[in-house]
């Protein structure tokens, strides 16, 4: 972690979102509200799926895992960002910075792949309804979930081996509100060519495989749905996919825009805004998107409220 007489810094300084004193407290209140909503909605959805037997289906098992990922994702980033609005020095320890970055990488890949698995689940449910119970058993669901963790952890190990070899002699100021790869690479005093190559290769592998899986799944879904004669069945099929497509568009659209743009178009200020969107805003939106028009979730919520009122 050191090169020559270079000593690895014990702390990094995060520049944060803004250095305007007049914006610090308003932004703190806004993002505190967003974080609170994120935790309440995601943890609430996890609890609801856990206690309601009618939601013990593959689709909701995956949704429960998505909510868990979003809750942890937001917790990895937001509390430290909130602290930067209140602190003058805005420091983060070297170990804290590395752990934050690796957690971020792990959760990003996991969510990326989980959205692809959810698309396949919808394909199996709509295109192969008779075989669906045999294709998507609970055992298969949990094996897929464990597989996602394994792939995400593999990506984590690759980035770990690369980042821990970098030295930071010239500067410890990270021009961001959290420890992401681009601002860390910028202040590294050693070559980051291999790190950048690994980010591109593994990022392309996971993101493109996820996008291709989603696109193929939805091509077959659309071809199946247009052949359905019943308007009610057709509406139900489309409605189960709309929320997932919205979540996919938000997450993958932001990731592709950020990490696959030409180098001459890159801007750290623009990168901060896009990072803010998918690390803070999207985890809040996902449970709202999946619950907004979902009759089964609404019915489960009504049952839970009725049960709580009855026993009190």
UniProtKB/Swiss-Prot annotation:
MF annotations from Gene Ontology: G protein-coupled receptor activity; odorant binding; olfactory receptor activity
Glycosylation sites: 5
Family statement drawn from the similarity comment of this UniProt entry: Belongs to the G-protein coupled receptor 1 family.
Biological role: Odorant receptor.
Gene name as annotated: COR6
Keyword list, A-Z: Cell membrane, Disulfide bond, G-protein coupled receptor, Glycoprotein, Membrane, Olfaction, Receptor, Sensory transduction, Transducer, Transmembrane, Transmembrane helix
Name of one Pfam family that matches: 7tm_4
Species for this entry: Gallus gallus
Residue numbers on the Extracellular membrane side: 1-26, 80-100, 165-205, 261-271
Species classification: Eukaryota, Metazoa, Chordata, Craniata, Vertebrata
UniProt-recorded name of the protein: Olfactory receptor-like protein COR6
PROSITE patterns for this protein: G_PROTEIN_RECEP_F1_2
Signal peptide range in chain numbering: none
Paired cysteines (S-S): 97-179
UniProt keyword Cell division present: no
